[in-house]
Amino acid sequence: MSITLRTYIFLDALQPQLATFIGKTARGFLPVPGQASLWVEIAPGIAINRVTDAALKATKVQPAVQVVERAYGLLEVHHFDQGEVLAAGSTILDKLEVREEGRLKPQVMTHQIIRAVEAYQTQIINRNSQGMMILPGESLFILETQPAGYAVLAANEAEKAANVHLVNVTPYGAFGRLYLAGSEAEIDAAAEAAEAAIRSVSGVAQESFRDR
């Protein structure tokens, strides 16, 4: 079976809001702030089961997220010991017979900032989110990434860089999506950090996406 390594990203320390968001939304072993985390997204998705099996048998990491959807599969594992997480990553790469350098280079598909969000729009956003609430008058940053898994990298780095609220993050599917809220200045700083994090990831260039 030929495997495409779509996302492979190591987070040295989960930030408080992202760790808490994962804890609220995931169905596995929930992480806490400060733990190291590894996110792996592959195609075809069903192969993610073999990935989880290999990582858990070889190391002490715990999985929070395993998603098998139509085309892609996503796995998150975490541990306080960064060495355990890195070892899990090496095991996964060996199992799939791929290299980290062969991962897809992420693209920013959409990035937008809405200033002074109206009250009615905040209600719509909050009803469809699982994180912090956005309040009327705050600024909203929306980011879409391809592959989807890199949305968590953007979220983690944005939280490191600015005092913002993590409204929602979706790291699986065709595109990853990130919603952040806060003051105008803090959102500007968060957006810059999130996009810089995506640009910093090396990998195999993708063909430009075309909506058919």
Swiss-Prot record:
CDD domains: BMC_like_1_repeat1. Transmembrane segments: none annotated. Keywords: Bacterial microcompartment. It is found in: Bacterial microcompartment. Disulfide bonds: none annotated. The keyword Transmembrane does not apply. Disruption phenotype: Not required for efficient BMC formation; when deleted from an artificial operon (Hoch_5815, Hoch_5812, Hoch_3341, Hoch_5816, Hoch_4425, Hoch_4426, Hoch_5814) being expressed in E.coli, normal BMC shells form. GO terms for cellular component: bacterial microcompartment. Artificial BMCs can be made in E.coli by expressing (Hoch_5815, Hoch_5812, Hoch_3341, Hoch_5816, Hoch_4425, Hoch_4426, Hoch_5814) or (BMC-H (Hoch_5815), BMC-P (Hoch_5814), and 3 BMC-T (Hoch_5812, Hoch_5816, Hoch_3341)). Cargo proteins can be targeted to this BMC. Residues 4-106, 107-211 form the BMC circularly permuted domain. It comes from the Bacteria. A motif (Pore gating residues) lies at residues 69-70. SUPFAM superfamilies: CcmK-like. These proteins have 2 BMC domains which evolve independently of each other, giving the term pseudohexamer to the trimerized subunit. Although the homotrimer fills the approximate space of a BMC hexamer protein, the BMC-T trimers are more compact. Their universal presence in BMCs indicates their structural importance. The homohexamers form pores at least 5 Angstroms in diameter; in the stacked homohexamer 1 pore is open and the other is closed. In the BMC the inner pore is fully or partially closed while the outer pore is closed. Belongs to the EutL/PduB family. Homotrimerizes to form a pseudohexamer. These stack, with the concave faces together, in purified bacterial microcompartments (BMC). A minor component of the bacterial microcompartment (BMC) shell. Expression of 5 proteins in E.coli (BMC-H (Hoch_5815), BMC-P (Hoch_5814), and 3 BMC-T (Hoch_5812, Hoch_5816, Hoch_3341)) forms 40 nm artificial BMCs with a molecular mass of 6.5 MDa. One of 2 stacked pseudohexamers in the BMC. There are 20 BMC-T pseudohexamers per BMC, composed of mixed BMC-T1, BMC-T2 and BMC-T3. The shell facets are 20-30 Angstroms thick, with 1 of the stacked BMC-T trimers protruding to the exterior. This is Bacterial microcompartment protein trimer-2. It comes from Haliangium ochraceum (strain DSM 14365 / JCM 11303 / SMP-2).
